[in-house]
């Protein structure tokens, strides 16, 4: 449990869906797998604003623009920068982006247009990474995190668990994230998606999920936000335990291709947590 903390709530928009040539084996958006996911190009600013306003109503303080693919085109980057600028004057949200591998000048350009935080998961340990993706490397991801940190952006970077990794892989990832001095760590648990190579993977049980959250809190210390994200719904009635184990943030409103909990369910959870935890 993290004392004297604040519940960090964020929401995301799937701003560009599918059309990805990478082979991340857990992901519905890879064009290499037949998952039936919707495919569409970058949304316009009004569509993204609509999602941002929904996030505000749900109590989110951060809003992330997420696009599929290894990296955006130059035209997409320019449009996203304009959208970020638009959101900064039309909402009270802090704006995050998850656009894949970017260079320092590209990240600086987004920061100049109002970007507060960059999200780029490392996913798992360097030794296990090739088991979940072969079209880019673990160190490609590390470089992007380092690029974002070096130009003064906040960084959100975490992993996905239940993909066949060992507990030591999880601990190694936590130690690397600590060394990188990231600001926020999302904890995602595999949701097996039909059509992906991991569609038949067994899901982690509640105890294993709680142990993972607790281990990350022990390694990361108290100054880093730990957010429960994809798969948190599978904790069911034990979801509050995640916060006693060390989480102090969560994603609301659903994920990229998977629905999350209902607004009413999350509202009740947040109200209860604030009372229990003193947030």
UniProtKB/Swiss-Prot annotation:
Domain Radical SAM core, chain residue ranges per copy: 2-232
Cofactor: [4Fe-4S] cluster; [2Fe-2S] cluster
Annotated positions binding [2Fe-2S] cluster: 96, 156, 227
Sequence similarity: Belongs to the radical SAM superfamily. Biotin synthase family.
Record GO terms (molecular function): 2 iron, 2 sulfur cluster binding; 4 iron, 4 sulfur cluster binding; biotin synthase activity; iron ion binding
Catalytic activity: (4R,5S)-dethiobiotin + (sulfur carrier)-SH + 2 reduced [2Fe-2S]-[ferredoxin] + 2 S-adenosyl-L-methionine = (sulfur carrier)-H + biotin + 2 5'-deoxyadenosine + 2 L-methionine + 2 oxidized [2Fe-2S]-[ferredoxin]
HAMAP family registered for this protein in UniProt: BioB (MF_01694)
The gene coding this protein: bioB
Domain of life (superkingdom): Bacteria
Name of the protein this chain belongs to: Biotin synthase
Pathway entry: Cofactor biosynthesis; biotin biosynthesis; biotin from 7,8-diaminononanoate: step 2/2
GO biological process: biotin biosynthetic process
Listed Pfam families: BATS (PF06968), Radical_SAM (PF04055)
Oligomeric form and interacting partners: Homodimer.
